[in-house]
Amino acid sequence: MRHPTAVVVSCLKKWFVGSEYEKVHVATKVPANIHGPVVRVDSAPPNRETPITDRTRIMLQAYGDDDQDCVDLLAACLDGLEMAYRADVAVMAWETDTEPYNFPDPDRPGVVRWQAAGTLWTALS
């Protein structure tokens, strides 16, 4: 069983293929030097909801040049996660519950960061 963040990273990379976001760096860690837009995928611990499913709170952080770029990138991520069941058989459902909001990074004051979040349900088998 893969960790839910690995599932989300994989789904977003597949979703971005052929789009303006194809070259966006999507990962669970932010590079020391940010060059271009970045999406960081983070999570709370998975919660075993049933014997065969996990429910996980997923947070998406978009780093970009300005507010609009980050909002647009997060909107693309949220759209991709709505369709994630097509990209990975482990995905059962996605529900966005927090639309993009400004989320400054205290370690990188010169970089714009926004965050959005939701819940991912995954199959264990």
Give names to the regions the model predicted:
Residues 1-9, 55-67, 82:
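Short N-terminal helix-initiation segments at or just after the protein's N-terminus
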Residues 82-125:
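Acidic-leaning, charged glycine-interspersed low-complexity segments
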Residues 14-15, 60, 74:
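Residue-level detection of beta-strand scaffold positions
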Residues 53-66, 70, 112-122:
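Oligomerization/assembly interface segments of phage tail-like spikes and tubes
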Residues 29, 44-46, 65-67, 121-125:
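Generic structural motif
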Residues 1-50, 84, 88-89:
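Small/polar-rich, solvent-exposed N-terminal microdomains that initiate assembly or binding
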Residues 33-35, 50-54, 108-114:
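A generic structural micro-feature
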Residues 64-86:
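Mid-chain, well-packed structural core segment of small domains
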